């Protein structure tokens, strides 16, 4: 073995062992998206059902959501966003842009309904939507088809569906932030260690 070659071989072997232990992530699969989407209703139910209103009936200031608003927003998105836009991509491609999404469209959805009713409604509509999504039996070529978002321009169906899952996670984070704010004064100096009390990320 030439001088330096042994060291190079050891470096290559070390790199290969690291890659084997920490493989590069594979492309996000539709099955991964569905796996998360089908768990969100149960997660919300476990966290929120029968909690005292002191946790759920306040917001973060003018123009922001309560926990009840967030659940209503998720229901509204099931009806108006993900599958309607997926169908439009499959039927029209980029020739017919998506309808604009009303961030406050959930107000009517929530009217007169307690949080447990909204949790039940979200569980039901999510199950219906996932059944339809599975029934589409989407193929790789279909996932690469593009539609036109009113502000973002061309977006792929695969991107829309991955965003559906990330949107769930965004609002789970938002719910934790809204709820944690109720403890802001009570935690005293421990607030320095609590990232959730410092976050002001977008949640709508």
Q: Which role fits each region the language model picked out?
A:
Residues 27-55, 77-88:
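Alpha-helical bundle segments that constitute or directly flank the non-heme di-iron/ferroxidase center
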Residues 46-49, 53, 87, 91, ...:
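Charged/polar positions within long, soluble alpha-helices
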